[in-house]
């Protein structure tokens, strides 16, 4: 598998072979990381009151016998409107899933290898919009001729960030923000050469 090296005009200049360590990775590593990332994003805000937490209803609503109705001990029972919820959600649940460092790295390498197979992994010398204008970023993105693209810079400067901010199908991040979830979530990746060299170095 190879990554496509682009020139300043976003045209193909050459190809760069991926290290052997990027191939033969179990896809389950990516599954575990994505599941962990999605679990971390859960708001965990749903919470219902149990019969012990609902206010009022301490008095027995009617006599045990003689009324012809089913016996009831409290208006807080789940069978009544306004009563507590049986087996309802609580916001004290921990959804975190642990993924170790090795699995995180394998997941990212697998995602990069998948992009290389699809021809959607691109390497450039630099990603920089010095003017800070969205128009210039859009021109660069249009020349790339890709959809839903993740740009990865060594260090993200403010002007480049602002230039891409209003282009809905792009996202620019720094090297330390790159992870398997983001890599798998975009149709194509454009990575600065310095970032790519670091990724390859860590894979050895």
UniProtKB/Swiss-Prot annotation:
NCBIfam families reported for this sequence: rplD_bact
BP term (GO), one: translation
UniProt entry tagged with the keyword Transcription: no
Protein's UniProt name: Large ribosomal subunit protein uL4
Record-linked InterPro entries: Ribosomal_uL4, Ribosomal_uL4-like, Ribosomal_uL4_dom_sf
Cellular-component GO terms for this entry: ribonucleoprotein complex; ribosome
Protein's job: One of the primary rRNA binding proteins, this protein initially binds near the 5'-end of the 23S rRNA. It is important during the early stages of 50S assembly. It makes multiple contacts with different domains of the 23S rRNA in the assembled 50S subunit and ribosome.
Region of interest (Disordered), ranges: 52-76
GO molecular function, one term: structural constituent of ribosome
Swiss-Prot/TrEMBL keywords: Ribonucleoprotein, Ribosomal protein, RNA-binding, rRNA-binding
Similarity remark: Belongs to the universal ribosomal protein uL4 family.
């Amino acid at each position: 598998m190879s990554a496509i090296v682009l020139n300043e005009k976003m045209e193909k200049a050459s190809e760069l072979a991926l290290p052997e360590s990027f191939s033969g990775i179990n896809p389950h590593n990516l599954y575990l990381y994505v599941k962990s990332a999605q679990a971390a994003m859960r708001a965990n805000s749903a919470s219902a009151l149990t019969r012990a937490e609902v206010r009022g209803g301490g008095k027995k609503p009617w006599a045990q016998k003689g009324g012809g109705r089913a016996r009831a001990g409290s208006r807080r029972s789940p069978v009544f409107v306004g009563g507590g919820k049986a087996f309802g959600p609580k916001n004290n649940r921990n959804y975190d899933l642990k993924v170790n460092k090795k699995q995180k790295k394998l997941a990212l390498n697998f995602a990069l290898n998948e992009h290389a197979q699809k021809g959607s992994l691109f390497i450039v010398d630099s990603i920089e919009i010095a003017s800070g204008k969205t128009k210039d970023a859009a021109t660069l993105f249009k020349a790339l001729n890709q959809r839903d693209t993740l740009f990865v810079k060594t260090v993200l400067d403010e002007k480049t960030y602002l230039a891409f901010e209003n282009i809905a199908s792009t996202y620019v991040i720094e090297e330390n923000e790159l992870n398997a979830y983001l890599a798998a979530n975009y149709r194509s990746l454009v990575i600065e050469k310095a970032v790519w060299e670091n990724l390859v170095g860590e894979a050895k």
